[in-house]
Curated annotation (Swiss-Prot):
Cross-referenced Gene3D superfamilies: ESAT-6-like
UniProt GO cellular component terms: extracellular region
Pfam family, one: WXG100
Stated family: Belongs to the WXG100 family. CFP-10 subfamily.
Keywords, in A-Z order: Secreted
Subcellular location: Secreted
Protein name from the UniProt record: ESAT-6-like protein EsxD
């Protein structure tokens, strides 16, 4: 017999919260990196092809992080919506069951 995983609305909401928290942490790390990058790229401190390459890397990190944040936000919002739908369907099913068989059978 295969093991099953029961997914609850609370599990979906908890996962959405974890995604948001991890994205905030990633954003903090990236902002720190980019701030350091801007400090290092000061022309008085550093110049040449290394600055250009480093700037391109920082720009790419920013672009990719924005994609991750957009996707992660959509995912988290979708999980919260799915949790609400699950609860709505469960309530509708319970009401339909009780209407069909009586209130004493559903509890």
């Amino acid at each position: 017999m295969a093991d099953t995983i029961q997914v609850t609305p609370q599990m979906l909401r908890s996962t959405a919260n974890d995604i948001q928290a991890n994205m905030e942490q990633a954003m903090g790390i990236a902002k720190g990196y980019l701030a350091n990058q801007e400090n290092v790229m000061n022309p008085a401190t550093w110049s040449g092809t290394g600055v250009v390459a480093s700037h391109m890397t920082a720009t790419e990190i920013t672009n990719e992080l924005n994609k991750v944040l957009t996707g992660g936000t959509r995912l988290a919002e979708g999980l919260v919506q799915a949790a609400a739908l699950m609860e709505g369907h469960e309530a509708d099913s319970q009401t339909a069951f009780q209407a069909l068989f009586g209130a004493s059978h559903g509890s």
